[in-house]
């Protein structure tokens, strides 16, 4: 079977890796192409395997979203962001709720990195949190309204974009501008189960909402032929910047 595919830069898919064994992680990664996605490394894998994992993935040609969601005093976050940039990652996350000074310090820490500077994005409200969850921790706002407020703060601090639910993406784009990057987790295919996230959308809904990057985990990592699944998703989104015949087998 052949598919029309795209250039590496055009893909909106970020595959979330979630493995406790580095050999299994690399075995999966060797089944997919960096032409079709980037990779997200979170707290569990980075804590287990450290920078060595990042290097191994970069050697295979993948751009890395280092999703450690930094949240600390400004100097500490600035130092952590600088250290992450030294690893050559493509994108770094921090928590917007850390506040204006923290986010400004993080931006300033990247000011001397030149053309290879990573994208710096702020997590707004975790997609696992509902309005009721926010009320319980003392935030008298809906998840959507709070996410929008944090996105505006992040933009004003100079960040490149935010991580948010697809439900807020369109509104945030309208307020913060077309060039403000939206990264959305909790993206599922139409036939998938919800998993542990309660504010989700399908890939097509996310595309229509203006999401720039869609974080997808188990629908790809648990697929029998993950590379074919990637191409199927990209074709369904009609992302064919460069038409190249890919033979899937």
Curated annotation (Swiss-Prot):
Similarity-based family: Belongs to the OMP decarboxylase family. Type 1 subfamily.
Assembly information from the UniProt record: Homodimer.
Organism of derivation: Baumannia cicadellinicola subsp. Homalodisca coagulata
Pathway terms, separated by semicolons: Pyrimidine metabolism; UMP biosynthesis via de novo pathway; UMP from orotate: step 2/2
PANTHER family per the UniProt record, alphabetical: OROTIDINE 5'-PHOSPHATE DECARBOXYLASE
Gene3D superfamilies the record matches: Aldolase class I (3.20.20.70)
Gene Ontology MF term list: orotidine-5'-phosphate decarboxylase activity
Reaction catalysed by this enzyme: orotidine 5'-phosphate + H(+) = UMP + CO2
Active site: 69 (proton donor)
Protein function: Catalyzes the decarboxylation of orotidine 5'-monophosphate (OMP) to uridine 5'-monophosphate (UMP).
SMART domains reported for this sequence: OMPdecase
UniProt-recorded name of the protein: Orotidine 5'-phosphate decarboxylase
């Amino acid at each position: 079977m052949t598919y029309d595919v795209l250039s590496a830069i055009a893909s909106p898919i970020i595959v979330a890796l979630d493995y406790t064994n580095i050999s299994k992680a690399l075995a999966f990664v060797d089944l997919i192409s960096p032409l079709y996605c980037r990779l997200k490394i979170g707290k569990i894998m980075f804590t287990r395997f450290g920078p060595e994992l990042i290097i191994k993935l970069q050697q295979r040609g993948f751009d890395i979203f280092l999703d450690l969601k930094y949240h600390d005093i400004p100097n500490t976050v600035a130092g952590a962001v600088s250290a992450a940039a030294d690893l050559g990652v493509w994108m770094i996350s921090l928590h917007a709720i850390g506040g204006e000074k923290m986010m400004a310090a993080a931006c300033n820490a990247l000011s001397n990195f030149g053309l290879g500077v990573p994208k710096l994005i702020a997590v707004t409200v975790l997609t696992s949190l509902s309005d009721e969850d926010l009320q319980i921790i003392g935030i008298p706002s809906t998840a959507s309204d709070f996410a929008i407020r944090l996105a505006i703060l992040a933009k004003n601090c100079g960040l490149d974009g935010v991580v948010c639910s697809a439900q807020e993406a369109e509104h945030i784009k309208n307020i913060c501008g077309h060039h403000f990057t939206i990264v959305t987790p909790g993206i599922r295919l139409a036939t998938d189960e919800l998993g542990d996230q309660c504010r989700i959308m399908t890939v097509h809904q996310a595309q229509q909402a203006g999401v720039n990057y869609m974080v997808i985990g188990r629908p790809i990592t648990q697929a029998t032929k993950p590379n074919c699944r990637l191409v199927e998703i990209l074709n369904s989104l009609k992302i064919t910047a460069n038409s190249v015949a890919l033979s899937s087998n």
